[in-house]
Amino acid sequence: MLIGKRISGRYQILRVIGGGGMANVYLAEDIILDREVAIKILRFDYANDNEFIRRFRREAQSASSLDHPNIVSIYDLGEEDDIYYIVMEYVEGMTLKEYITANGPLHPKEALNIMEQIVSAIAHAHQNQIVHRDIKPHNILIDHMGNIKVTDFGIATALSSTTITHTNSVLGSVHYLSPEQARGGLATKKSDIYALGIVLFELLTGRIPFDGESAVSIALKHLQAETPSAKRWNPSVPQSVENIILKATAKDPFHRYETAEDMEADIKTAFDADRLNEKRFTIQEDEEMTKAIPIIKDEELAKAAGEKEAEVTTAQENKTKKNGKRKKWPWVLLTICLVFITAGILAVTVFPSLFMPKDVKIPDVSGMEYEKAAGLLEKEGLQVDSEVLEISDEKIEEGLMVKTDPKADTTVKEGATVTLYKSTGKAKTEIGDVTGQTVDQAKKALKDQGFNHVTVNEVNDEKNAGTVIDQNPSAGTELVPSEDQVKLTVSIGPEDITLRDLKTYSKEAASGYLEDNGLKLVEKEAYSDDVPEGQVVKQKPAAGTAVKPGNEVEVTFSLGPEKKPAKTVKEKVKIPYEPENEGDELQVQIAVDDADHSISDTYEEFKIKEPTERTIELKIEPGQKGYYQVMVNNKVVSYKTIEYPKDE
């Protein structure tokens, strides 16, 4: 039991999240980097099987050499106590197979969005000379945001490798297997392209194109049967999209896309207006194709040689007898004429069936597939017209035969030509474009076309409330009005935005938040002793208020504390006179440190012969201090620090 086990002292296994024939996948915690990872562990049954170990390691080596947003990242590879493991990126979501089961068939636009990511990943692998060889929805992950990750390169092979496995022991899944793999050929880049076409078919229809009771029967269908039309199960599929499937799944690799990049380019342009109604993709048969030459047996050669000898001998004999026969020829000619006349009379009167074709009743082939219907007609001795005509029918499924011309049970002569009519299904109507209309207008327009199964999905959008912003199927799609459903996506207007509390936001952060939510900033400024300069002081409407995109929000930003003026302080200073000898002059220096003076400079200098009083003026800034000192004969006699005066 691996749950709870710590591998390599680093990966704590939490629970099982998946598994396959070769390995199980667990959710684990990387305790060093504090993140969730997926860890694939080779089954214990194969821990001693060198081939499986080699294939397991190849998966890590193949994927780790690739760097693409749609390929699962490989973090680590190792072995501990016969536990072989690969540590990889954890994708929180589900497999594409599970997604199709839950949501299929998908809308063509969603299907192509998914396929574009998958094909981009495979194109990157091909550029690095790696063929995946097991492309299927089970090996593709999709997260909750619709992002795709291709995984499971367990049987991927480098094209330059000398260990490419031939498919006589077929690896991969038979439902997605290319014809060349099914017949035992090499898996190439074009084999991956074939599998991509099958995946696109499954996305659009919710089903696989070929199924059967055994792997062999399915493989035979890949070899022999044409890929069915996706439109049969999803009429909303444009021809440009179906053509991608048909080209990718061509039986001969020569007729497929040359590269995955070519397929990706077609996917990106499939909904361009000039492509939506393009002609169906078909493969032109080469008129100069080599025809089979029947084998001539030895006996036939001998017979032909004998006949030639007989001709030569007869010619020689005839030459000898020629003169004798000339006399008998009128009697011979008369005898031959009598024989032919007698035979003609007998043929017309006694044996008419020898010259007249027999009567045949045309069988009823309605509801049959073309091959079965044509076979039945030919069995009755009838010729089948090469051109099959199409006709709508309310009861017979699309693609099956409806009727013949002449009609069933009509008696005709053997060898007569019969024309087949194939059902296109129930009569279809091309749905109009109702986007941009109000929901009531759209419903009326659709009802006028006969569409009664209309559902509405309401979403927030910038368009006015009640406006149709999307329709599914898209305009121009042919549908059966009495059966097919039309889904309208209708705007209920922009979603309300609940304002955040913008306090402590800088001007840049506040304006960015409002812009991201489509709100207009009305900027104001005010002094604040509490809020640092440049930050939000207040907002209007208040935090928690619901507003619509486009509304104005008034935001007041702090200018910081309001600046006070510098103040002048007057100080009276008494200077003592204390000479060593009476009558000596004393040198006085006054220094001031304030807004206008530096303590290193002399504010005032003079001489005294008696005690003196002076008034000093100091200019002090708010929050600052003033200072003065008095020196007599270079000796400090007084000094003082003065605070900024408080307001009265």
Swiss-Prot record:
The keyword Protein biosynthesis does not apply. Signal peptide: none annotated. The record marks 40 as: Required for activity. The modification Phosphoserine is found at residue 214. It is found in: Spore membrane. It comes from Bacillus subtilis (strain 168). Changing residue 320 to A: 2-fold reduction in activity. It catalyses: L-seryl-[protein] + ATP = O-phospho-L-seryl-[protein] + ADP + H(+); L-threonyl-[protein] + ATP = O-phospho-L-threonyl-[protein] + ADP + H(+). GO terms for cellular component: plasma membrane. Bryostatin activates PrkC activity and induces germination, whereas staurosporine inhibits PrkC and significantly reduced peptidoglycan-dependent germination. Kinase activity of isolated N-terminus stimulated by poly-L-lysine or myelin basic protein. Its EC number is 2.7.11.1. Changing residue 214 to A: 4-fold reduction in activity. Protein kinase that is responsible for triggering spore germination in response to muropeptides, signaling bacteria to exit dormancy. PrkC is thus a germination receptor that binds peptidoglycan fragments containing m-Dpm (meso-diaminopimelate), which act as spore germinants. Autophosphorylates and phosphorylates EF-G (elongation factor G, fusA); the latter modification is likely necessary for germination in response to peptidoglycan. Another group did not detect phosphorylation of EF-G. The active site is at 134 (proton acceptor). Residues 1-330 are cytoplasmic. This is Serine/threonine-protein kinase PrkC. Disulfide bonds: none annotated. The chain crosses the membrane at residues 331-351. The cytoplasmic domain has Ser/Thr kinase activity. The C-terminal extracellular domain containing the PASTA repeats binds peptidoglycan. The modification Phosphothreonine is found at residues 162-163, 165, 167, 290, 313, 320.
